[in-house]
């Protein structure tokens, strides 16, 4: 999935680790990611958390998509910092999943908390032979 994610690539995201139900993704903040107050645009932080969430929830043979998500911003960040998003599966029931993503700065201080809700489809992940659900 991440190999074809042009948006994440354009933002310079790097996958640091993947395990079943878990993913770690980082990104160096650039000047063009800052808003009018010279702090990181919230959509950039959301995109990082959303990418970690997407990787964590696509650990099976079926395409899993977001059914909803929300984010709480805790601290501002600025250009030159590296953010790291760690997504963790909290619970899965049938086709539905719930994931928490913590976004931290260079000092491992939380700067945002994201909660994602997922829904697994019948579609196989590209390049895999998915068993029936």
Task: List PLM regions with ranges.
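Hydrophobic beta-strand-centered segment that forms part of the acyl-chain substrate-binding groove
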Residues: 54-84, 89
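A generic structural signal for short beta-strands and their flanking turns/coil linkers
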Residues: 9-11, 21-23, 42, 63-69, ...
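Short, charged/polar surface micro-motifs in flexible loops or helix N-caps
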Residues: 20-21, 30-33, 51-52, 79
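HotDog/MaoC-like acyl-thioester-processing domains
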Residues: 77-79, 90-133
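Compact, glycine-rich, soluble single-domain proteins
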Residues: 34-54, 58
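Non-catalytic linker/capping segments at the edges of enzyme domains
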Residues: 1-26, 30-31, 129-133
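Detector for glycine-centered tight turns/loop "hinges" at secondary-structure junctions
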Residues: 38, 61-62, 108
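Residue-level recognition of well-ordered beta-strand positions that form the cores
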Residues: 26-28, 70-72, 86-88, 102, ...
